[in-house]
């Protein structure tokens, strides 16, 4: 008998992992699987995620070796690709047609405001991402698509094709904010194929092909950079017309950097606040004041303006591609992707007054 096709696979370290590959199959975040009703569960203080985060998937896995990543090649002996945790959670695998049907049938109860295709370093990743994109736009045109790209395998023509096929936003996971940190965590130093120059090519192509407000860069705070370095990078992206999607460094179990400390809370809160000011409040990194250690000591705004921004809580929510409701708030709320619910770094929901007080205390050190 031919084997029954698998519609859904939940990571199981004690069973042989089935061979599942894109474009027939995709991995999705645990939050997305809960929102779609594919796995039981509830998320602390948030009912759902507003972005369906999908990963292309292959049994051979990602061929890159980024030091902080749970999907990295160096984990091959320890865990099958489909079983690897990534940004703190499991990524179940589902049949793509089943995912589309569930969303079309309203399994997300209208919660998804965006879908994101995350590419990995694999020879088939580009072509398969085109297939996933085209299928989605044909079936669910009312839910816009973002591409989290893999510049290492791409050329400018690929961006033009993605725009033609209906992608709305194109993002680049630069992650490291200096060439030195990039090289140490993603480049030759760790036997990984990524190159700083190629990533910048992709950001410049995105600015040209997708245009202002339609591209962005992922940046990770806490990998050895100063606050001045990461905020000057935010300003550079903003001046090109892009947005900055900020992630807190959290040591991923099984990664080469699993023993690194998580980002300092005060540093993270100041960077979150300054990034919001740069992206949405008309402030500039070159108008901010930094001390000798590169820490922000003045955000370049009046006290009352700064207090109103902090009180809104918005700077401390997860940053990413926007939803329909508020361009300053990310649809991609990645619940607990960089911290546990007991010590939230990126809030996947609107903050209440108690949350804001906690954040203020953290900022004050």
Where do the language-model regions lie?
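Catalytic cores of alpha/beta
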Residues: 155-164, 223-239
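Conserved strand-turn element in the central/C-terminal portion of the radical SAM core barrel
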Residues: 148, 152, 188-189, 202-228, ...
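Alpha-helix termination/capping residues and helix-transition junctions
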Residues: 63, 108-109, 164, 209, ...
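N-terminal pre-triad scaffold of radical SAM enzymes
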Residues: 31-76, 105, 114-117
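Alpha-helix-loop-beta-strand connector modules within alpha/beta enzyme cores
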Residues: 129-145, 194-213, 264-283
